[in-house]
Swiss-Prot record:
Residues of the S4 RNA-binding domain: 14-75
NCBIfam families xrefs: PRK10700.1, pseudouridine synthase
Basic and acidic residues composition-biased segments: 267-276, 284-306, 335-354
Protein name, entry field: Ribosomal large subunit pseudouridine synthase B
Protein source organism: Pseudomonas aeruginosa (strain ATCC 15692 / DSM 22644 / CIP 104116 / JCM 14847 / LMG 12228 / 1C / PRS 101 / PAO1)
Length: 386
């Protein structure tokens, strides 16, 4: 019988920042900043970075007790949002500009965590989740989640420029490159559309790469994040919530186990259906963000009727450099998924008239005959018969 006591140096419990991230209090990076600022307490004492806690420890953030029982009931939720131009990626803007959180559904517990950022002039795909660990893994460079953008550049683009952007150029914060560049249809004159892929989410990286070649980016839109595509069914300024299958695929990409979703009550299902119909319509002119305009009122929750599952790909995770050598080139521009729910545009009726010759005179227009309105009182009045 071995009477040797257990090793006292074996760590007990789980790291504090990981616990709070999993409960959806914030991303792991956010929690680490809060701990460094002294905003997190454990059992009444200021917490330290890397401190381990168990289920019996009382955790407070800014004086508010984190109720783990209520937080444990929350599930992993993910939103796909089509960000319009003019919205800033912050929760509270001191200038009163619209933010990306204004139109998201309100949560009873936890909060929405944005996966990465887009600058105010960039549109397109943004992901939100209630799982801080999922958000942290999706943003971490070690998981190599590729981002694809549609970009319109102004200026003459040469093959030498494309080669330099693929091989890598030196920016202010270090070397950067595209893993793939494909020319897209559209554009006139010196305006050209391209689809390009980057393997990290550095600040304004796509714009700075094109500008390093003396080109001007006139439009920029993110169209894909890892396996998640932005389809035309999700209109600008709208969002939809991923279903269980989509969340499982996205979670497997970063090595997380699936989390089961609870059944919806009848009242919750009816509310979701109402908001689903509401989210299906495009934004009204008064709802669109504009420069210098004050923040729009918060929209209630809802989801788009159309759902699109992300394409399944091999699972990703932190890999040693030796195993990553074969993927140094990154990923190419992905093939767009078929939008089966999209209705075909009605074809315009062809004009059967013969084409006009250069010397022909324009056809004479028929005179417009103005009809006189009926005289007042002409007709059946309520409550009377003729």
């Amino acid at each position: 019988m071995n009477d040797t006591p257990e090793n006292p140096h074996v760590p007990v419990g789980e790291k504090l920042q990981k616990v709070l991230a999993r409960l959806g209090v914030g991303s792991r990076r956010d929690v680490e900043v809060w701990i460094a600022e002294g905003r997190v307490n454990v059992n009444g004492s200021v917490a330290s970075l890397g401190q381990r806690v168990d289920s019996h420890d009382a955790i407070t953030v800014d004086g508010h007790l984190i109720r783990r029982e209520e937080a444990a009931e929350s599930v992993r939720r993910v939103l796909i949002y089509n960000k319009p131009e003019g919205e800033v990626c912050t929760r509270d803007d001191p200038e009163g500009r619209p933010t990306i959180f204004d139109r998201l559904p309100r949560l009873r517990t936890g909060r929405w965590i944005n996966v990465g950022r887009l600058d105010i002039n960039t549109t397109g795909l943004l992901l939100f989740t209630t799982d801080g660990e999922l958000a942290n893994r999706l943003m971490h460079p070690s998981y190599e989640m590729d981002r694809e953008y549609a970009v319109r550049v102004r200026g003459e683009v040469t093959e030498e420029m494309i080669e330099r952007l693929l091989n890598g150029v030196m920016l202010e914060d270090g070397p950067a490159k595209f893993s793939d560049i494909q020319q897209a249809p559209g554009g006139e004159g010196f305006n050209h559309w391209y689809h390009c892929v980057v393997m990290e989410g550095r600040n304004r990286e796509v714009r700075r790469l094109w500008e390093s070649q003396g080109l001007v980016v006139s439009r920029l839109k993110r169209v894909r994040f890892g396996p998640v595509f932005l389809t035309s069914e999700l209109t600008m300024g709208r969002y939809r919530e991923m279903d269980q299958r989509e969340i499982d695929i996205l979670s497997e990409e970063v090595g997380l186990k699936p989390v089961a979703l609870p059944g919806m009550t009848t009242k919750a299902r009816e509310k979701a259906e109402r908001q689903q119909r509401k989210q299906a319509r495009p934004l009204a002119r008064s709802e669109r963000p504009e420069a210098g305009r004050k923040r729009a009122p918060r929209r209630e929750d809802g989801e788009n009727a159309a759902r699109r599952a992300p394409a399944s790909r091999p699972a990703r995770g932190p890999q040693p450099s030796a195993e990553r050598k074969g993927r140094e080139q990154g990923t190419p521009v992905a093939e767009r998924p078929r939008e089966s729910n999209r209705k075909p545009r009605p074809s315009k009726p062809r004009d059967e008239r013969p084409a006009s010759a250069p010397g022909d005179k324009p056809a004479a227009r028929k005179p417009q005959v103005k009809r006189r309105p009926k005289p007042a009182g002409d007709g059946m009045r309520p409550g009377f018969r003729r």
